[in-house]
């Protein structure tokens, strides 16, 4: 660079370039991830699943956790108001019966509904709650092994996880559930917007709402790339905690939001 070309000046603390990380470690794995992007645009991927949006919330173990469900529910309601073509499925774990097994508390019916929804397909899955590298929530609402075994080919969602370390990709000695969700070559996700470290509830709320607004371009039909939506969200979020949120996937990819092309030409065979 020329002298002083890399000097940081001014007070701008935002992001200039939309970034996406395609996490691969070999040419064969890179080819598999590129192939998923091609399949995402293939005619075989067309279907009503692209109108679906699924929310999945952790249960309320304390008063703070209760706000996770309320906030995620409100997010979904605003989305359907802004974009009426979106069909929202709400999976709130506290709406299900909790069972206690030898390994701890579980929500088998909520988990089944979530896995079934993944197989049927949705454009976006949005989870808000606790999590670690191995699973979502202490009730194991979604586990690493399940991410590896998904078979939802041609129905790849964007997986949004506002949690802790479910997609902590900077430890080469420990692969996470989020990474396996992305690496699944015939299932899993087309990309993830995910946290790599713990995120505060307040920042999580703010980013989740802004992200959905940016992804679905409220008030417009000019939809941005997923990476650009996250860039706009990060700029609009004041907290430094926003830095733990990353986009895993093709930075040039847009959500496959259906474009209505119905043209009325005749009524009862009369032009």
What are these regions (language model features)?
Residues 1-271:
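Cysteine-dependent hydrolase recognition
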């Amino acid at each position: 660079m020329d002298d002083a070309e890399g000097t940081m000046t001014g007070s701008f603390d935002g992001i200039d370039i939309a970034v996406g990380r395609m996490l691969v470690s070999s040419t064969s794995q890179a080819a598999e991830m590129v192939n998923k992007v091609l399949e995402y645009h293939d005619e075989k991927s067309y279907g009503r699943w692209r109108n679906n949006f699924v929310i999945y919330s952790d249960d309320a173990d304390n008063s703070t956790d209760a706000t996770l469900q309320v906030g995620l529910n409100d997010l979904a309601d605003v989305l359907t108001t802004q974009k009426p073509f979106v069909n929202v499925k709400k999976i709130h774990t506290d709406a299900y019966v909790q069972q206690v097994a030898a390994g701890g508390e579980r929500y088998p019916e909520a988990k089944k509904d979530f896995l079934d929804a993944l197989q049927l397909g949705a454009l976006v899955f949005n989870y808000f709650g606790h999590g670690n590298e191995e699973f979502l929530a202490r009730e194991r609402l979604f586990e690493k092994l399940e991410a590896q075994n998904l078979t939802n080919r041609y129905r790849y969602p964007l997986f949004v996880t506002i949690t802790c370390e479910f997609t902590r990709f900077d430890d080469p000695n420990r692969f996470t559930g989020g990474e396996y969700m992305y690496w699944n070559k015939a299932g899993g996700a087309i990309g993830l917007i995910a946290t790599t470290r713990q995120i505060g509830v307040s920042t999580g709320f703010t980013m989740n709402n802004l992200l959905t607004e940016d992804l679905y371009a409220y008030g417009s039909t000019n939809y941005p790339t997923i990476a650009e939506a996250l860039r706009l969200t990060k700029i609009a979020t004041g907290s430094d905690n926003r830095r733990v949120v990353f986009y895993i996937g093709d930075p040039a990819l847009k959500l496959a939001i259906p474009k209505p092309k119905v043209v009325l030409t005749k009524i009862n065979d009369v032009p």
